């Protein structure tokens, strides 16, 4: 199984340096990862370095809390695309989801989808570790209804990461036609394969080299 082609090679820590970003980019090019996932500050740098490569530039929106206003998320999306982003991973408005304010949650996603329309894929991070099963299902349904391309488990900055049972639930909820991204705490090839077998079509990891280096 060629896992590399579905990995978003990720560096989102606040203390990430330019040297680390350049290393990330080189590793992504050498191993044909799906994308590099970097904070918005680094999108232009990554886009320039990857212009002759099949590796996409992915960034994060409303990250890591999802508590920005919709207008802020829209601006972040537009700015990221202007700087060269081809995929955006937005964080759902978790508090509004828990308050059952589904219209707000759907509109929040929909506006980012509109801002990205035809220019970038949109992945919606639902932060599974903070949600009940009912909330996970509702979040996935709202993301699909709003026109997002993927649902994604985690930011990697909360209380937990990707679990196979969550991926199974997300896949069952969105059906076969939508992407499901597993991220957060994935360190080994074995873990990645379990998540793929559960229904993940993309893996987000900072330990990508370790994952693909294992037999």
Curated annotation (Swiss-Prot):
The keyword Cytoplasm appears for this protein: yes
Alphabetical list of InterPro entries matching this protein: Aldolase_TIM, DeoC, DeoC/FbaB/LacD_aldolase, DeoC_typeI
rRNA-binding among keywords: no
Entries under Pfam families matching the protein: DeoC
Entries under CDD domains matching the protein: DeoC
EC number: 4.1.2.4
Compartments, record wording: Cytoplasm
PANTHER family named among the record's database cross-references: DEOXYRIBOSE-PHOSPHATE ALDOLASE
Protein name: Deoxyribose-phosphate aldolase
Provenance organism: Clostridium acetobutylicum (strain ATCC 824 / DSM 792 / JCM 1419 / IAM 19013 / LMG 5710 / NBRC 13948 / NRRL B-527 / VKM B-1787 / 2291 / W)
Gene that specifies this protein: deoC
């Amino acid at each position: 199984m060629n896992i590399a082609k579905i990995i978003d090679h990720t560096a989102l820590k606040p203390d990430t340096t330019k040297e680390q970003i350049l290393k990330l980019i080189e590793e992504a090019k050498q191993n044909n990862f799906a994308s590099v996932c970097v904070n918005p500050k680094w999108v232009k740098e990554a886009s320039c370095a990857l212009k002759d490569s099949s590796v996409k530039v992915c960034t994060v929106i409303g990250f890591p809390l999802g508590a920005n206003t919709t207008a802020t998320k829209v601006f972040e999306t537009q700015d990221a695309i202007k700087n060269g982003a081809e995929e955006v991973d937005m964080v759902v408005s978790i508090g509004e989801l828990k308050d059952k304010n589904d219209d707000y949650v759907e509109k929040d996603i929909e506006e980012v989808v509109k801002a990205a329309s035809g220019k970038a894929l949109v992945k919606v991070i639902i932060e599974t570790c903070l949600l009940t099963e009912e909330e996970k299902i509702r979040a996935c349904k709202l993301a699909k209804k709003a026109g997002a391309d993927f649902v994604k488990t985690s930011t990697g900055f909360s209380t937990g990461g990707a679990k196979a049972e969550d991926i199974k639930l997300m896949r069952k909820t969105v059906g076969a036609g939508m992407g499901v991204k597993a991220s957060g705490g994935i360190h080994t090839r074995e873990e990645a394969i379990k998540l793929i077998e559960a229904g993940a079509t993309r893996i987000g990891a900072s330990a990508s080299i370790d994952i693909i280096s294992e037999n």
